[in-house]
């Protein structure tokens, strides 16, 4: 059983307790951690929509540490990221594999980051089906359609040609952050919070 820390705040009405993730949502920080499945995706989508309703012009930061998961669940998060008005900054902590890497690349251009020791992996979708030959053919055609769609999404967000994307996606392709930056999955590798330019404003402090 995972223990989730509780944060207690003093308010004008007394003490108020939040789980740590809910408290971070107040700061417009969302976590995509663990396998991507329907229940988790529903929570992430709800958080994105809530934060847009709170302030449609302020950035949302999405921290990603995921091995991937269900394609349709991941695409529901992806579509919502593209649908809402606020910029969504993405940051890989730990790993962003499979659908996790797609969500990482889907952040707002110029605001996609990775910590230096993270791991990023892309590959084509996989699946299996048992049944009648006709049904197997139907499911095979569907997974090929999904593969094409995912390749087109990577093409859009990385700037690579579809042919290059298809070549990279043929097998599991593991990358360190710098390799991911070179192929356009992220924009920058960061080691400290001060490396990130918040809301594209450069703040320089000068002494003396």
Swiss-Prot record:
Transmembrane segments: none
Function: Cleaves peptides in various proteins in a process that requires ATP hydrolysis. Has a chymotrypsin-like activity. Plays a major role in the degradation of misfolded proteins.
Coiled-coil intervals: none
This protein's UniProt keywords: Cytoplasm, Hydrolase, Protease, Serine protease
Location of the active site: 98 (nucleophile), 123
Record text on subunit structure and interactions: Fourteen ClpP subunits assemble into 2 heptameric rings which stack back to back to give a disk-like structure with a central cavity, resembling the structure of eukaryotic proteasomes.
GO BP annotations, alphabetical order: protein quality control for misfolded or incompletely synthesized proteins
Family: Belongs to the peptidase S14 family.
Superkingdom in the source lineage: Bacteria
Keyword Cytoplasm applies: yes
Protein name per UniProt: ATP-dependent Clp protease proteolytic subunit
Catalysis: reaction(s): Hydrolysis of proteins to small peptides in the presence of ATP and magnesium. alpha-casein is the usual test substrate. In the absence of ATP, only oligopeptides shorter than five residues are hydrolyzed (such as succinyl-Leu-Tyr-|-NHMec, and Leu-Tyr-Leu-|-Tyr-Trp, in which cleavage of the -Tyr-|-Leu- and -Tyr-|-Trp bonds also occurs)
Gene symbol of the encoding locus: clpP
């Amino acid at each position: 059983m995972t223990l989730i820390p509780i944060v207690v705040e003093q308010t004008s009405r007394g003490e108020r307790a939040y789980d740590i993730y809910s408290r971070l949502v107040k700061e417009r920080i969302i976590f995509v951690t663990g396998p991507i499945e329907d229940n988790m995706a529903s929570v992430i989508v709800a958080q994105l929509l809530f934060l847009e309703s709170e302030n449609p012009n302020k950035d949302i930061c999405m921290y990603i540490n995921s091995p991937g998961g269900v394609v349709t669940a991941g695409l529901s998060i992806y579509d919502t990221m593209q649908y809402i008005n606020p910029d969504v900054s993405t940051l890989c902590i730990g790993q962003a594999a499979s659908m996790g890497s797609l969500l990482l690349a889907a952040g707002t251009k110029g605001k996609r980051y990775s910590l230096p020791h993270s791991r990023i992996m892309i590959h084509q979708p996989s699946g299996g089906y048992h049944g009648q030959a006709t049904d197997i053919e139907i499911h095979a055609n569907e997974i090929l359609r999904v593969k094409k769609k995912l390749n087109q999404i990577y093409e859009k967000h990385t700037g690579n040609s579809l042919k290059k994307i298809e070549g990279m996606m043929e097998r599991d392709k593991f990358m360190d952050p710098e390799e991911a930056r070179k192929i356009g999955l992220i924009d920058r590798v960061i080691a400290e919070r001060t490396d990130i330019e918040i809301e594209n404003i450069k703040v320089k402090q000068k002494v003396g």
